[in-house]
Amino acid sequence: MKKTALYLLAALALTGCKKTQATADGDAAQQSTEQAGATQADAEKLLTPEQIAQQWAKGGAVSVKGGGEKPDIVTLVSAFNKAWPTDVTTTLLESAKDPKFTEYVNEDTGGGMACDRGNGYVSVSAGDTDEDCMEAAVWKRKNGHRLFIINLVSTNPDNRSLPEKQALCIYDYDPKTETMTPEENAVSKFRASADDLKLMYRLPRKGTDLTIGEANEEREDALWHFFEWNGSQFSEAIAYTEKELTKKIEGSWMCKDSDEPMLTFNIVADDANGPQIEDCAIYGSTEYDAFVYTWDGTLIISENGDSGEDRNPAIYCQFRLTKQDELTGTYYLRQNGGNETKGTITLKRGNPAW
């Protein structure tokens, strides 16, 4: 029973009212039932990411009372949660009531929460559970508005690295009206390149650029697309493209031994089923040889057989670009039995490979 109720009972006793213990217990039971009913009613109002995805487009604007000119990320998430209440955002906001709260990590599950007000970012991760998760971030616009994005995800119990269902909600916040209005942009319009690929959104905690990955159950390594922020809007997705070599390296070369990748990149590997999304890195290893063909911009990593044996290609790579116009990677090679040589590969943006 609440303290106020206890104080009231004490006052009634002092004034001679005959409030029996049985009656008090009955009141407590009734109050407990009412609280349980209220909790159940609140739970019934909570929406799943799938429900929000189905209804959000028709939801309209969201009021942000007291948002002012510089609303922080918690204020915007709170306004969203009033219009579209979910368990995961409610949980985050409960912790965010403490202005000093920044992070929580569940050591048992690997999940947790982050509340970075300074960088305009919050998240809830599921770890190795099947709970829902979310990310939200805010961007400053040159016209004084804010771009607010929140992504709510239902975890796939069979593959936690891929979303089961998700709701990506994007708003423009107007400080004059203290209102968030749904917005379409390059991110919301982006579609997967194949029907069996799912999209994975990654909002930035630091920096301003956003990434979207494509992956499926068979191939978990995502092909990432980058969206650059220009202060007002996102660019169209930057295509991954074929590479050009800045230095011609001929012959058979072996990578220098290394525990860290010397160059990482996405590739498209052709097999009997057509183009396949691959994620690749050049690691230093004595078990593989690197063959570089400069005339068509391809690289073959092959198994390292005994001296004099033919080597069958293990991976046939066509480099694809990350977000930069130009990306240069340096790695060290040594010819079989020879001296170590430094090689450089530069990737440049061109026409999409497919």
Predicted features by range, described:
Residues 226-227, 231-235, 240-245, 288, ...:
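Edge beta-strand at a domain terminus
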Residues 15-16:
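C-terminal motif of bacterial Sec signal peptides marking the signal peptidase cleavage site
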Residues 179-243, 290-292, 301-320:
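Short aromatic loop motif centered on NTY/YTY
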Residues 24-140:
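Terminal domain-start segments
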Residues 259-297:
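N-terminal glycine/threonine-rich, aromatic-flanked beta-hairpin/loop signature
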